[in-house]
Amino acid sequence: MRSFSALVFLLLAASVLAADDSNSTPPAPPKAAEKPVIDIFHGTKVLDNYRWLEDGNSPETQKWVEQEMAYTRGILDRLAGRDAIHKRLTELLSIGSISAPILAGHHYFYTRREGMQNQPVLYVRDSLNGPDRVLVDANALSADGTIALDWYYPSETGKYVAYGTSPSGSEMSTLHIIETKTGRILPDTIERTRAASIAWKLDNSGFYYTRYPKKGEVPAGQEMYNRHVYYHELTNDPEDHPEDSDPLIFGQGRDPEDWPGVSLSNDGRWLLITVEQGWTKTELFVMDAKANTPPTRITTGKNFRYNGEIYNGKIFITTNEDAPRYRVLVAEAGNYERESWKELIPQSDAVMQGAAVWGGKLFAEYEQNASSQLKLFDLEGKALGDVALPAIGTVYGSGGRWDRDEIFYAFQSYMFAPSIYRYDLKTGETSLWTKVDAPSIDPAAYEVHQEWFQSKDGTR
């Protein structure tokens, strides 16, 4: 058995650098022009000389990128032995990728990228172990493979899937809707849906979604801000119901940098709007979707992060409020007094990455000692035990539903290629659902050990 270590990568890098057998002087890197921009944050002036490089559509930026690429190639192409290393790394990096499924109705939706495909493909299974069926293949949408599948959201029953595509890495998606059974593309399209958040109504008739403004609707330069929440009703003739007529639900008059997301309760009554304000603060708003009342803020306005889910009239909130490693609080939907919130799962030594109600249980993901942990709780906060993982490694996605007795999680490690496992809530058994094949790697030939060392300040 061989021990696997990051030292392998250091030795590989050293071998590449040592292989440079050219004595010629490398070309000079391109010089980026300095164009000072000064921002004032909390009374402190911050100088940014390279703000202009953030505009990827600027001819000046594109010219600099071309020069930088030429410089990079001038360095890398001189390295002897590079072709052999490139070949082996290509083998290792071309095993593809896979995502945890999203469950809707009796369907299982997930993405997979095979080998050197430019874009992942959206597949659907109509039963647990049924055949995979291609639903959206972004690779077929352009000759050069540069149209990306950015995101997707199945409707509650899985009848439809809303998905976003964008060209050439722009990420400014256009929303499309496909019928799962037939593959028919509906006429509804919505532009400017970058990184969209979508919440379908339970009857598949429409959805709440986020959208950015058109040019001219906001001051110049603000088009990548002012993300608002709208509602769209499906229609057979979008000319009779253009996106511009979709009613605005949330965002008017708020900070242009707000980043709202949406979700609906399992009974379809409550719309939860989660508003990211930078990297350290989140606000939660709740709207009675049946009564169509204005959204009500339920958080305190303090500098904490919150993420929530409404199930059977209760709001389950994951937060770092007075808990830097996060905890779960619970409150009654409709009663937003902060004093009525109760702690359901206290913070622990591990850092909680998230929690969700699946199969009538709380499924919580933690990270400790650079490795993932999965734990189950009942809805009163009682610990029910851990979900055993295949090895020391990382859970990079999960999926489930409030009305299904199964949970899926995506797992990978140094020796495990990306794999999707299914946990049966009734039996407590875990099984492999699907995985990425890595034929050039033999996991049995390696061992993975986690070693600890003491730093200068005494920290282990």
Locate the predicted segments by residue.
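Boundary at the C-terminal end of the N-terminal hydrophobic targeting segment
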Residues: 16-19, 24
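N-terminal hydrophobic alpha-helix used for membrane targeting or insertion
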Residues: 9-10, 37, 163
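Bacterial N-terminal signal peptides
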Residues: 5-15
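Short acidic, Pro/Gly- and aromatic-enriched capping/linker segments at domain boundaries
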Residues: 25-42
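Peripheral, non-catalytic segments that deliver or gate enzyme domains
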Residues: 44-52, 56-107, 111-134, 138-460
